[in-house]
Amino acid sequence: MPRRSTYHHGDLKATLVTTALDVIAEQGVGALSVAEVARRAGVSSAAPYRHFASRKDLLIACAITAAHRLTGELRAAHAGAADPGDPVETLAAAAAVYTRFAAEHGSGFDLIYAEELRDAGSQELLDAGRGVMDVLLPAALAVTGEDAKSALQLLERQIAAAHGYAALLRSDFLARRHATVEDVASGAAAIARSLANDARRAEQAD
């Protein structure tokens, strides 16, 4: 019996990216293979290579898509923060969004800034990654008195906490207390709020 395709003619490229992101969500970035994506999409193993010359090219497309999705969710979170005018609350809302995103999609900055993509030479990927930081950085700068180094350090700590929460949830480490995505998102937001308040106090003390 011939294999039935899961895509409509003309949108194979988008289908492959969506399918690849599903694989990443289930198994992680390292598990992604072109062959598995083709199998799930219901096409021949050669079909993806009409759009992506290699696994790396497919991964780049996934990273760009993930960055755009995350940027959109972060923008929405900023607008819906408890106090949109307070950069501390903006950062807390962003941490919650990032945690949900990483928990539900199986990746976050580890895909967008994957080591194997650092020398990819994709301007579109660089722009997509900058787009995420462009959403996060203004609030961090406001908290740290426009000190770029301190702002980046603050974001690094907040993202590390958020990503760590998501990873612990996905690994079932938190299963014994029946933690949910919302539980870890709230935890990440609390840490982000604490770190931002500490940074604000340090800036005001100078």
Q: What positions do the PLM features span?
A:
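Helix-turn-helix
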Residues: T15, T19, V23-D57
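N-terminal intrinsically disordered/low-complexity leader segments
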Residues: M1-D11, R200-D206
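Amphipathic alpha-helical linker/stalk segments
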Residues: I64-L91, Q123, D127, G131, ...
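Hydrophobic alpha-helical connector segments
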Residues: R75-S107, A148, L155-Q158
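Amphipathic alpha-helical packing segments from all-alpha helical-bundle domains
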Residues: Y113, A120-G145, L152-E156, E182-R193
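Amphipathic alpha-helical segments used for helix-helix packing
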Residues: A103-A120, A167-A175
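Generic hydrophobic, amphipathic alpha-helix propensity
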Residues: L12-L21, V37, C62-A66, L70, ...
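Amphipathic C-terminal alpha-helical segment
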Residues: I159-R177, R193-E203
